[in-house]
Amino acid sequence: MFYRENGQFKTSYRADQQIFPIRQDRIVMLLLLAVAFIAVPALASDYFLRAILIPFLILALAAVGLNILVGYCGQISLGTGAFMAVGAYAAWNFGVRFPGMPLLAQILLGGCFATLVGVIFGIPSLRIRGLYLAVATLAAQFFVDWAFLRIPFFTNYSSSGNVSVPQLTAFGLPVQSALEKYLFVLILVVVFTLLAKNLVRGAIGRQWMAIRDMDVAAAVIGIRPMYAKLSAFAVSSFIVGVAGALWGYIHLGSWEPLAFDLARSFQLLFMVIIGGLGSILGSFFGAAFIVLVPVALTNIPHMLGMSLSVDTAAHVEHMVFGALIVFFLIAEPHGLARLWSIGKEKLRIWPFPH
């Protein structure tokens, strides 16, 4: 009853091609942005910002990048953690070797280097697909881990391999407190999400989806598979690299290569599967789920008067993730985003059954 587009007429192609063509969607999005930019800074504690919201935003951005490659272009990747590591270490090296370089420039250049590495390891996608491509991208994970552990140049000859970021400033403003870091990350996530949304709605996005559905047929109608696949790897790696730089600079502050290990790659893949393949919104759903489930598994036993050790809670977390992945692959392959779409369709006809 409240979610209907009755009387909302479009008089131009531009109006019909809006990201949110229905007025109710625009209102909801504006309300969410108002909550994120106004209510959260006013009400959220430092712990909530540092432990939940900042990791959620950064992981959601990384999931958006991975979803472009896996969900929209159909090229499976198990090297996302490696591309995050390249973005983080490249940004850190620019900051160390070029003192005075702006923080935003460091992060964007880190994304550019992640793009280069992603395209190099995306070249096998021109000849192989499926599990073979997954193994090829898995090689990127092992190679990058080895490089950052064994080549001291990347860590500025640190004996432990651990690197730390100095005091952060952006555009002359400090980025030190939890609130300042949250707002900095939020602005970047909103900008890159809008860019990703417009890309997948444009010509290049349609090429990615054509390659995903049937690359031979896409080539027959004039789409160049090499350009489409490598562009998907480039865009995905850039966004993931930016997310990796944010993860190191904003969330961790000090890290080592194990912060971007294979477990991180699988975690991001789980986000995309649970949230919904081929859905930008699903990336946020998946990230929220992955971030909140450990919190729930930690707090619910205490609320019930039970006590779980750290190891037991970690095992339960993995069991829940595995069970949910199997559930979504069988019952709803399009994930939480599809359930959200079904809910909106029900609202359109409520209170009528059909």
Task: Go through the PLM ranges and name each one.
Residues 1-354:
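Transmembrane alpha-helices and adjacent helix-loop boundaries
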